[in-house]
Amino acid sequence: MISGVLVYSSRGELVLNKFFKNSLKRSISDIFRVQVINNLDVRSPVLTLGSTTFHHIRSRHGDNLWLVTITRSNANSAAIWEFLYKLDAVMNAYRLDREEALKEEFMIVHEMLDIMLGGNGIPIDTELNSVIAQMSVKPVRNMGGLLDSPDGNDVLSSSSSPTSSAGELHFPKFLTKRSSSFLGQGDSTSDFYDNNKITWRPKGIIHKKDEVFLYVNERINILVSRDGSILKSYVDGTIDITTHLSGTPICRFGLNDSLGMQSEDEKKWLAQQQRHSGSDFGNKNFIPKAAAGSVLLEDCKFHECVSLDKFNRNHIIEFVPPDGSMELMKYHVRDNINLPFKVTPIVTHSTRDNEIDYRITLKSLFPGKLSAKDVVLHIPVPPSTVDCKISVSNGHCKFVPEENAMIWRFNKYNGLTENTLSAVTVSTSDTTQLNLQQWTRPPISLEFEVMMFSNSGLVVRYFTISGKDSKHRAVKWIKYISKAGSYEVRY
């Protein structure tokens, strides 16, 4: 979102610049100086020249420095200005709001920007306490008051932070930059779950009943060719969670992903879960029937509360959840997809009466103990069709002229069952064989929803909660929901 950050003195001298896009050159700073700083008539906090936009503010402290961002996309201006004011506050905490101090300790600001914007220019962490906790150098005084260090000690009283007789700050030598990702910070779990970093969960939450609801939502997308071969198939999934937990709980669960099952830490946790009985997600009764073996997860994206360092090392998902509902992660699966339905269409053209004859078989492939709801098969017909003679073994089917389709519906469809449809179209009197031959034959599409069935085979193998302030045992629920995305069959 942000391509670069510039800091000017009150006179218009460029003091600091940091670019996140290689396409930017240092000469771009001259454009802002000429168009805004040297132009007293400009009062707008945003300037757009072609595809380049400058957002700027004046620092409210010290030498009233110019803080400027450069963007080359349709960025959110409100978010950028909020970032600039947060940057101003952090710089003030480090007494870097004066030109001379900024020139001497400019690398401190570079580290701030690495933490606040990451490596791609997108604001990821702008909370003052959280940013300071991740900095390699701590400020001695924060806006005229005392600033507590992450370990709870007063930084001002520490002998490791030297000050001169004039009261000016002298920072120790800059060592190394920390990771630009907030979620991967720290070498220990306790460092990641520092209360200063948990900005998404208030302190002191109390619930009469501790509960966790985990939802594995999947949408299967598939395209079947005329000969029955699968042209493409993949699953887009999300794991949503609703928590009502007291205190500051640390939740941890494992999946049967192929990399995670090879982790030694994962094996230890699974063995521990198998030794304990009770209503846990590790219980086989909570595993969907379609799941088997391991699953290769791709393109995983996580909520900010998840410890990426833990996932990258051991493929264990560990987090302090916000109170309420949220989307915990997204994932993508392409291999070993479990198909819930098989559609076998036989569509022929009768040259004698200009009719289209349909013989369609719909078979459910999920276990017989399960059932699907809201099953809808959308069967296209030629635009010249005025009616259809339909016969079905089960369900309800009708011709919908405004959609040029037959709609076959089932309120409930049991597993391992098969139903058939036979239909003949009735065309208008002026319909010719050429019209029917030129018909593009749009694919048949299917809609459905199956509970406790996993299209990808993904399984939550265990779920544990620690650090909970409540004395009551948390009740944990899990639900697998499989739906159709783009489920199409050619004929």
Curated annotation (Swiss-Prot):
| Cross-referenced InterPro entries | Adaptor_comp_med_subunit, AP2_Mu_C_sf, AP2_Mu_N, Clathrin_mu, Longin-like_dom_sf, MHD, Mu2_C
Record-level GO BP terms: clathrin-dependent endocytosis; intracellular protein transport
Annotated MHD domain residues: 209-490
Checking Pfam families in the record gives: Adap_comp_sub
Q: Which UniProt keywords apply?
A: Coated pit, Cytoplasmic vesicle, Endocytosis, Membrane, Phosphoprotein, Protein transport, Transport
Gene Ontology terms: cellular component: AP-2 adaptor complex; cytoplasmic vesicle; cytosol
Location(s) in or outside the cell: Membrane, Clathrin-coated pit; Cytoplasmic vesicle, Clathrin-coated vesicle membrane
Q: Which CDD domains match?
A: AP-2_Mu2_Cterm, AP2_Mu_N
Its quaternary organisation is:
Adaptor protein complex 2 (AP-2) is a heterotetramer composed of two large adaptins (alpha-type subunit APL3 and beta-type subunit APL1), a medium chain (mu-type subunit APM4) and a small adaptin (sigma-type subunit APS2).
Q: Any miscellaneous information on file?
A: Present with 3410 molecules/cell in log phase SD medium.
**Role noted for this protein:** Component of the adaptor complexes which link clathrin to receptors in coated vesicles. Clathrin-associated protein complexes are believed to interact with the cytoplasmic tails of membrane proteins, leading to their selection and concentration.
Q: What is this protein called?
A: AP-2 complex subunit mu
* Organism per entry: Saccharomyces cerevisiae (strain ATCC 204508 / S288c)
